[in-house]
Amino acid sequence: MPDVKTASHTVGTAEDRVDLKTMGRAGLKDFVAEHGAPRYRGDQLFNWVYGKGVSDFDRMSNLPKRMRRGLQRDATVEDIEIVEQQQAADRTVKALFELPSGREAETVLIPAIDERGEARRLTVCVSSEVGCAMGCEFCATGRMGFRENLTPGAIFDQVWHMNEVAQEHFGRPVTNIVFMGMGEPLLNYDAVLDSISILTDEDSLNLSAQKITVSTVGLARRIKDLADDQLRTNLAVSLHAPDNETRSRIMPVNEAEKTSLPALKEALQYYFDKTGRQITYEYCLFKGVNDSETDARNLADVTRWAPSKVNLLMYNPVEGLNFERTSEAQLDRFVQVLVQEGVTVTVRRSRGQDIDAACGQLANEGEDA
C-alpha cells in the first residue's frame, strides 16, 4: 500500500478491505507503518477521517497518489448515517443509525433548556452496542439480547452527526457525552476507549474528557481497568438496588459473585483510590421494589463511603414489563431520607418519553430477533 510501489491497484471487495474506522490515531499509524509508509501518514489519515469527516481517499490531497491507490485497494472508511429522526415535545432528538451490517442503533440528543428557551447544555447519549447482554429486567434494550459491538468509528459517528443536528436545531455544538444508550460500554471496552480518545483529540471534535460519562451495570474487573488506564472521564454505576437480593432479582449481572455488590464495592474502592474521582450512582425507582425509606437508608450506607452523588430516576414504562413508577410523594420521602443521611442527590427528570427516547426505552422496534 502507501508510499511503496504496488503491482496492482485493483480495488478489493469490502470483505477484503480493512475499515479504518475500527482504529484510532495509534492504530492508523501502526496500519500505515505495516504497509511501508511513514507513521506520520497515520496522523494525516486521522485528520481526514475524524477531523474533516472525509471517507473518499481521492480527496485526501496531502497523501501521495500511490498511497491513495493502495488505500482504495486495501482499506475502506465505513460511515454510518441517520436513517430516521424524531423530535420530542421537550426538544429531545432521537436518531436511528444504520450500521454497515444493516443493523440499527439509536442515539439521543438531550438539550438542557434555560429560562430564555436556549440550550445551555447539549448531551449526546450514545450507544456502544446493538442490543445488550445484561438482561436487566426493566430495560427495553436488555430484552433485545446482544447483537453487535459498535466500532470506534460508529461510536464517533453518532456524536459527529448529532453535533450537526445540534448546530441545526440549537445553533451550538454538543457539550457532553454519556455512554448510556444501547449496550454495556465496558463489554466493548477497547472500542469505547478508542472512541473516547478520538472524540477528545484536538484534531477531531476536541471534547473534554471531563464532559464524558461512561455508565456501567458494574463490571468489577473493567472498572479496575478504567482506573488503571487513567481516563479522565466520569464514571456512573447503574445500581438500582441497595442490597444483593433485590439487585439480583432485577439485574441478573448481580447474581455472579464477581459482579455482585461486594465485588462492585471493592472495584469502586480501587477506582477511587487510583483516580480520586467522584462516583455517580444511577438509581431508578420502581414502585414496591426499591423505593421504601429502608431502601433509601440502605442506599446511603452503600454509597457514602467515598465522595459520590446519587441520581434518582423515575421509571419510564416499557410495554410488556411488569414495573411501575413510584409516586411523586414516595420520591419526595426517598429524597428526604437520603438528604438526612448526608447523601448528595439529584432527581433526573426523563426527557423524550413521547418518542421512546428516555432511559431504558431504547430498542429499535424494527430489529429482528
From Swiss-Prot:
| GO CC terms | cytoplasm
Q: Where does S-adenosyl-L-methionine bind?
A: 183-184, 215, 238-240, 316
Q: Which residues form the Radical SAM core domain?
A: 118-354
Spell out the Pfam families in the cross-references: Radical_SAM, RlmN_N
| Cofactor remark | Binds 1 [4Fe-4S] cluster. The cluster is coordinated with 3 cysteines and an exchangeable S-adenosyl-L-methionine.
Annotated catalysed reactions: adenosine(2503) in 23S rRNA + 2 reduced [2Fe-2S]-[ferredoxin] + 2 S-adenosyl-L-methionine = 2-methyladenosine(2503) in 23S rRNA + 5'-deoxyadenosine + L-methionine + 2 oxidized [2Fe-2S]-[ferredoxin] + S-adenosyl-L-homocysteine; adenosine(37) in tRNA + 2 reduced [2Fe-2S]-[ferredoxin] + 2 S-adenosyl-L-methionine = 2-methyladenosine(37) in tRNA + 5'-deoxyadenosine + L-methionine + 2 oxidized [2Fe-2S]-[ferredoxin] + S-adenosyl-L-homocysteine
GO:BP terms for this protein? rRNA base methylation; tRNA methylation
- The primary site where this protein sits is cytoplasm
Where [4Fe-4S] cluster binds, per the record, is at 132, 136, 139
Which Cys pairs does UniProt list as disulfide-bonded? 125-359
The protein's superkingdom reads Bacteria
**Gene3D superfamilies (alphabetical):** 1.10.150.530, Aldolase class I
What UniProt keywords are attached to this protein's entry? 4Fe-4S, Cytoplasm, Disulfide bond, Iron, Iron-sulfur, Metal-binding, Methyltransferase, rRNA processing, S-adenosyl-L-methionine, Transferase, tRNA processing
| EC top class, as a word | transferase
EC assignment? 2.1.1.192
Protein localization: Cytoplasm
Q: What does the UniProt function comment say about this protein?
A: Specifically methylates position 2 of adenine 2503 in 23S rRNA and position 2 of adenine 37 in tRNAs.
Entry similarity comment = Belongs to the radical SAM superfamily. RlmN family.
Matching PANTHER family, A to Z? Answer: 23S RRNA METHYLTRANSFERASE (PTHR30544), RADICAL SAM CORE DOMAIN-CONTAINING PROTEIN (PTHR30544:SF5)
State any further remark: Reaction proceeds by a ping-pong mechanism involving intermediate methylation of a conserved cysteine residue.
What is the name of the protein in this document? Probable dual-specificity RNA methyltransferase RlmN
Q: What is the lineage of its organism?
A: Bacteria, Pseudomonadati, Rhodothermota, Rhodothermia, Rhodothermales
